[in-house]
């Protein structure tokens, strides 16, 4: 195996960012397009229900950004894009990511998250990409017991998935590792905890709480609400991804966590309090099938090797996030009404 080891130092590089109109990907686009004006960035997104062109529309005014509508599973489209653009780096944010949807319809998760990853890596090999980065999730590790707060996920924690979603992401991670070992594709993988911040599609916990509470509707909470998640602000996550892409060791996995564990019920109560809404809006509903108990990440590898650190604590980050939603209620309304689907005219 010959691996094309390459450290990115910036300057006149061309990046493909897949899934760049989604929540995490669009925040990443805003971060890198403004931070690295000397580099070129192409965003590829299929604009499925969770992809919103409005998230990145203003970036098209920048000289170093271009949007392309397309699906990562479309082998012909992807190959032509690689041929035309001659990418140096590929960062794959594109994914079906809602656990509940994966329980109802696993097939699309396998297609997008595994086959789509294969299509991107085949093109990366064919066209000599210098670095392929896979954005993954801590859910591939399964869950941790609630009564063992000392336990954390490390990069050596075995994969032990609970849902079709996490299984599809784990399958993609294993395939990425296989392409590194078998074909010498220079890869890195990041696994993050639960993200929050601006532009999050209102199907995930925090924007669901906001949109329901603002309408004085019942806020659904699975089970007893005691399941624990580690929360990381999307900006901190994306800074970590950028450091891994540019300085991470080829073939390695890096965990990125927020060190901010909260029960789901605590998160709900925190947001209701900030909005001045009554806890009477909370409605406990039947628990999710196979609901993971607790996620908690050890990020010491990224901290020590790459100098990565979080800048947001949960209290400040959630306040800033809710303030953003309050200031951008038209964005929320466009999504809830479906009007956002008409934003892209290309």
Predicted regions: what they are:
Residues 35, 41, 51, 70, ...:
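C-terminal substrate-binding subdomain of Rossmann-fold SDR/epimerase-dehydratase oxidoreductases
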Residues 3-195, 320, 325-331, 337-346:
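N-terminal Rossmann-like NAD(P)+-binding domain of SDR-like oxidoreductases, especially those catalyzing
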Residues 117-118, 170-177, 207-210, 238-239, ...:
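Conserved active-site helix of classical SDR/Rossmann-fold NAD(P)-dependent CH-OH oxidoreductases
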Residues 79, 121, 177, 209, ...:
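Short glycine-/small-residue-rich flexible loop motifs, especially phosphate/cofactor-binding loops
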Residues 147-148, 202-210:
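A glycine/serine/threonine-rich, flexible loop-to-helix segment
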Residues 18, 111-114, 165, 169, ...:
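Short, solvent-exposed loop/helix junctions and linker helices
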Residues 27, 54, 80, 101-104, ...:
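Generic recognition of short, well-ordered alpha-helical segments
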């Amino acid at each position: 195996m010959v691996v094309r080891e390459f450290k990115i130092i910036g300057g006149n590089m061309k990046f493909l960012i897949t899934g760049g109109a989604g929540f995490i990907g669009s925040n990443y686009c805003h971060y890198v397009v403004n931070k690295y004006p000397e580099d070129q960035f192409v965003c590829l997104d299929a604009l499925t229900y969770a992809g919103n062109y409005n998230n990145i529309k203003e970036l098209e005014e920048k000289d170093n950004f271009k949007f392309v509508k397309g699906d990562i599973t479309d082998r012909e489209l992807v190959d032509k894009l690689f041929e035309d653009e001659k990418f140096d780096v590929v960062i794959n944010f594109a994914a079906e990511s809602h656990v509940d949807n994966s329980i109802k319809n696993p097939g699309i998760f396998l297609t997008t998250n595994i086959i789509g990853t294969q299509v991107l890596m085949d093109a990366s090999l064919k066209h000599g990409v210098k670095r392929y980065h896979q954005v993954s999730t801590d859910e591939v590790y399964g869950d941790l017991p609630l009564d063992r707060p000392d336990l954390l996920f490390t990069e050596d924690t075995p994969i032990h998935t609970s849902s079709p979603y996490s299984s599809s992401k784990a399958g993609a991670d294993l395939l990425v590792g296989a392409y590194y070992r078998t074909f010498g594709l220079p890869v890195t993988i990041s696994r993050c905890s639960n993200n929050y911040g601006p532009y999050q599609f209102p199907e995930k916990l925090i924007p669901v709480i906001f949109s329901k509470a603002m309408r004085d509707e019942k806020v659904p909470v699975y089970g007893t609400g005691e399941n624990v998640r580690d929360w990381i602000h999307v900006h901190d996550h994306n800074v970590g991804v950028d450091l891994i892409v540019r300085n991470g060791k080829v073939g390695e996995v890096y965990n990125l966590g927020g060190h901010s564990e909260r029960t789901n019920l605590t998160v709900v109560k925190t947001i209701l309090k900030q909005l001045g809404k009554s806890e009477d809006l909370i409605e406990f509903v039947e628990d999710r099938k196979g609901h993971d108990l607790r996620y908690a990440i050890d990020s010491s590898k990224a901290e020590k090797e790459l100098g990565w650190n979080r800048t947001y604590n949960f209290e400040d980050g959630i306040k800033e996030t809710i303030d953003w939603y309050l200031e951008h209620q038209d964005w929320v309304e466009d999504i809830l009404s479906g009007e956002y689907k008409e934003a892209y005219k290309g």
